[in-house]
Amino acid sequence: MAIQAPKGTKDLLPMDSYKWHYIEDKLKKLAAEYALKEIRTPAFEHTELFERGVGETTDVVQKEMYTFKDKGDRSITLKPEGTAPAARAFIENGLFNEALPIKMFYFTPVFRYENVQKGRLREHHQFGVEVFGSTEASVDAELIGLAMRAFKEFRIDNLELNINNIGCPECRKKYNDALREYFRESYDELCDTCKTRFERNPMRLLDCKNKKCKEIGKDAPVILDYVCDDCSNHFENLKTYLDSLNIKYKVNPYIVRGLDYYTKTVFEIINNDITVCGGGRYNGLIEQIGGKPTPAVGFGMGIERLILTLMENNIEIPKPKEMDIFIGSMGDNGKIEAFKLVNALRTKGLKAECDHMNKSVKAQMKYANKIDASYSMIIGDTEIEEKKANLKRMEDGQQFEVSLNNLDEIASMILK
């Protein structure tokens, strides 16, 4: 029996990679316009980073992480999200000594042991943005604007932006007390996970996926009634900045996000009832994992989810021309000459290919059609002797006589 890929993973095949290149190129261009610079962090980190940063009571840490002991008996985890590793890199490399704010983006694989379903894999890829060093609500609004603009760049219009303010540790104490009071009378009906969270982190009860727990929590107290003046002012400033960008939003007091590091601003972007992007502010994370107190804000966007959203909205990703020219050959001398010519034309910026399968001339031309070559040429003894050949435009069959000694002429005809 042939070995298959692990459940929840998916191969990116050569005929589909152009979709990813298109998305990554657009997002990189957009990131540059916002003065974001790329960061790359390891695929695995010390488990403690996520336990301290993401939160021990979260679903991610309790149920979804791929954790193992390495040969040095150290607990290692494949990263389930990108923010904590970026924060660790910020501290470890002394980026707090650089001019602030530090603005960064990344493309990264993330790993979560989840139930596999449409749009949800155990390995997926994320575009993430993080900004370290500013407390200003203008940065929150800027990143939300970037995320919304990204979807507009991909022609996805039917979006709903939900925002909330989940306060700071001080004002959350009062809110947690109110949540305990609310859920206490239904405690026996809660799932086992929520019973554990009831004392340690009652806000996580609002993030439970259990149907019964969701039903119990639908009339729970809202955080906006408990936030302190500083958090409230930050939220009002955020709304003012969003209004200045003409970004429509809905205040949803039940958005808490699934990670413990969030403070103040949290947001989600929805398309057809599916969350396609989410993020928020995390002013305490850097200190939690051993750094100097540093405010920060960021978001994550799943690439697989984005591609699925494009498909569901019937938005085609433009397919680039795969091959500029295919050079076929006749005989041993023709094969060597075609091989040399193909490699020479590649130095002129052309996507060029020749026969590597010893096919007949007819089969070579079928292959040229199959790989969608714009032009083709056949090289045999006659062409080698006369130093010229016919360049065929595949679209209409028109042929042009060209000199094999003038590569610039051939390249200019194909690229014009």
UniProtKB/Swiss-Prot annotation:
> One GO molecular-function annotation for this sequence?
transferase activity
Note whether NAD occurs among the keywords.
no
Keywords associated with the record: Aminoacyl-tRNA synthetase, ATP-binding, Cytoplasm, Ligase, Nucleotide-binding, Protein biosynthesis
Q: Please provide the Gene Ontology terms (biological process) for this protein.
A: histidyl-tRNA aminoacylation
Note the InterPro entries from the entry.
Answer: aa-tRNA-synth_II, aa-tRNA-synth_II/BPL/LPL, Anticodon-bd, Anticodon-bd_dom_sf, His-tRNA-ligase, HisRS-like_core, HisRS/HisZ, HisRS_anticodon
According to the UniProt entry, what is the EC number of this protein? Answer: 6.1.1.21
Compartments where found: Cytoplasm
Annotated Gene Ontology cellular component terms: cytoplasm
Q: Which domain of life is it from?
A: Bacteria
The first-level EC class reads ligase
Annotated S-S bridges: none
Under catalytic activity, the entry for this protein gives:
tRNA(His) + L-histidine + ATP = L-histidyl-tRNA(His) + AMP + diphosphate + H(+)
- Predominant location: cytoplasm
Q: How does it assemble?
A: Homodimer.
Q: Report the sequence similarity comment from the record.
A: Belongs to the class-II aminoacyl-tRNA synthetase family.
Protein name (database record): Histidine--tRNA ligase
Species this protein is from: Clostridium novyi (strain NT)
